[in-house]
Amino acid sequence: MKILEVIYGLSTGGAERLVVDLCNEMSKTEDVTLLILKEVNHFYLPQVSPNVKVIQAHWKIGFSIMQQYKAYKLIKEINPDIVHFHNSERYSMILSNILLKKKYSFFMTIHSDVEKNYKKGLSGLQVKLCGLLGGCKFITISETNYLQFQKLYPKFQQILIENGRALPQFTQQIDSVKKEIESYKKDHNTIVFIHVARYHPCKNQEMLIEFFNELISENINCILLVIGSGFETDKGSKIVEKANKGIYFLGSKNNIYDYLKNSDVFCLSSIYEGMPMSIIEAILSGIPIISTPVCGAIDAVKNGYNGFISSSFEKESYKKSILEFIKHKDSISDYSEKNKNNSKYAITNCAQKYISFFKSTIHKKK
């Protein structure tokens, strides 16, 4: 089976992380081509398997009818059985999806909150056009994500495939990472919180930093590690400036599992998500999770077992969950460690579900 994966770019992000892992895993048994459309930062590109054919289109950022036509021509040249695109590529694939629907099977993975991002506007229009006129099949990535889509678009074919991630592989840097984190700690009892996400308003990082400023000023023995890009931008740097001592911005890292392994708890403060890849990485690393009640997190985190979900997006609610974790830290950490080998979120399981779904549509078309 010849599969074409289409992505905007390979900068740091959950969709980008999934695409690389998915391509690598599927290429073990299938013919996989990865089409990268835009000229943006390709952080994950070195991690793409040699088994995957990579095509870089070098399009300029923005939307144009010419890009729609170029996508149409590229797909015909590649001639795949499957065209699988992701939410960042939605506008570039509309024309191809409609005109080539009888020749190829088109799929779109929804990586974000459906209610907030696909109910109306251009994104909602795109889903309707591809679903109604292009016969596109949709993949949702968490139970809540699935139910939201089913409610809004009951006539469109969709399937739930939870996001997957390659199992933890530690690098030669793990010992130096351990020493680095130890140097940040006040003493051996310091609780290490870690937040992995690029800077973006939807991540609600301003609230997160305000909260940890308060926590540290109240002499709670903890530190916060922030890993991700974008904090060097004008808006991101303002958050950095507000952070007190005990909050460390470490930039992007390609050895994220080394940092998770040496942290005590993962924290997410987002306003909306689809199924955060960072939560899956935390689960597979065996560390507890504290999160706001976003799509995906509410499906993966069981209150009082592998972490806590705050009752709302407000700072006081989030604080209550953090303090509850500190109170029950040992039992929560033990449960998370014992249940880290969760095949539900392993990329092997995820990729096999994609392959099975793809093959079922090829059979129907024939």
What is each stretch, according to the model?
Residues 4-6, 185-203, 209-212:
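Conserved donor-binding/catalytic core segment of Leloir-type glycosyltransferases
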Residues 41-47, 223-245, 250:
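Short, structured helix-loop element that forms part of the nucleotide-activated donor/catalytic region
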Residues 5-65, 145, 160, 230-232:
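N-terminal strand-loop element at the rim of the active site
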Residues 288-291, 301:
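Short hydrophobic beta-strand element within catalytic cores of glycosyltransferases
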Residues 150-151, 162-183:
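Acidic anion/phosphate-binding donor-loop and adjacent secondary structure
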Residues 85-92, 110:
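Short His-centered aromatic/hydrophobic patch
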Residues 303-304, 308-315, 324-329:
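Conserved acidic donor-binding segment of nucleotide-sugar-dependent glycosyltransferases
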Residues 252, 271:
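Aromatic "clamp/platform" in nucleotide-sugar-dependent glycosyltransferases that forms part
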